[in-house]
Amino acid sequence: MRYVISLLLLIGGLSCSDANQPLPGPVGVFDTGAKTVTGQWPLATPSELGLSAESLLNLHNDVLQERYGWIDSLLIIRNGRIAFEQYYEHDYRAVYGDEAQTLGPLVVNSPSGPYNYFNAFWHPYFKDTQLHSMQSVTKSILSAVIGIAISRGDFPDLDTPVLSFFNVDKTAHVDDQKRAMTLRHLLTMSEGLRWDENIPYTDPKNTFTVMARSLDWVQFTLDQPMESEPGTRFNYNSGASLILGQIFLQSTGIDIEAYTAQHLFQPLGITNYEWKRTPFGLADTQEGLFLSTRDLAKIAYLYLQKGRWNQKTIIAESWINDSLRAAFKLNDELRTGYGFQWWSQRYQYQDKSYVAYLGKGFGGQRPIILPDFDMVIVLTGWNILPDKPFLHAEEAIERVLSSVIE
């Protein structure tokens, strides 16, 4: 049964008159074992962390009323302590039951398999556990592991050509542009391959959907023709992260799941996770991870702390900075950028401009890092149909920061 931090935390920050009003939704219990940031998280009332309990309760009410579709969890950490944590139950077997039976863009290869996004056995929670699908937040964690491997001398220089790891004679559309493609280009999704992942995943013309029906996803991606000079244009491509996963295996001789467990998860105290495999048997480094909300928060908090955890360096600060720095500034209207498999989001607060850093996963997975407020926001959800309301990162930041009182 999934644990829930009690809304009594919020009551502690409300006035007596507010506290006497009935609370929406189920009231859970404190996790009294939450004592240290290296194991369980320490708890605090919102007011102790300079946040308005009333504002957070308003946000909670909107989530309960499904203003933002199906959000599964919301966790807010400030100054290293949990200010708010709530889990929202949805009967996904009932919600998506009909769609789960028929092959289509979101039911790939087999209705009973791990790439049926409507199958409640696999999504959003792994087999009724607390492990939630991370979707493309997996890419951000892949970046973290590559950074660790580079610092340990286990991964090649980022300017190494991609084709040096593959049989060129068995790769389609090889030209000078493809020969110029490097690991850095894969990390920043500027590799130049022809790829359209900007249309909804429900559209069978989405290149990712076409790839998912193939047996060897890495080779499928590598075989795509070039459409731009590497390093000149950002184009979101999940296949690029899969190529990085294959190169990781070839470079280190170690499966990335085992390497991640030893060098990232173990130092953070992450012991429960699941990692899907592609049809070819490779760890799915573009969307395959399942983590609990609290463990995802550990990843975000590690980046907030510049790679340090429990006074030890897990990821080099230089890699953290390079990962979060926007290699490409994307949409001026949305004010977004993209680094090493991490997004950046510019936002306004009290007439000042700030930058947030985040991972983005299909369905609503959002670890959001706000360095200027010593804050981490983690959202999980399963809004996988294009017509469903959605809590976008900028609005999530705005809603949470509206609760800041000091």
Residue spans for each PLM region:
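Sec-dependent N-terminal signal peptides
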Residues: V4-G12
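N-terminal leader/targeting segments and the immediately adjacent pre-domain N-terminus
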Residues: L14-F126, I150-F155, S214-L215, E227, ...
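Active-site SXXK
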Residues: L57, G80, L103, G113-P114, ...
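Short, charged, amphipathic alpha-helices and their helix-cap/turn boundaries
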Residues: Q86, Y96, A100-W122, T160-L163, ...
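Active-site helix/loop module of the DD-peptidase/beta-lactamase fold
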Residues: W122-H123, D128, R152-L193, D223-M226, ...
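Active-site-proximal alpha-helical segments within enzyme catalytic domains
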Residues: A240-I247, E287-R308, Q365-W382
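Active-site Gly/Thr loop motif
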Residues: I270-Y273, R277, N321-V378
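Structured C-terminal helix/loop/strand segments within mature extracytoplasmic catalytic/sensor domains
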Residues: G359-E406
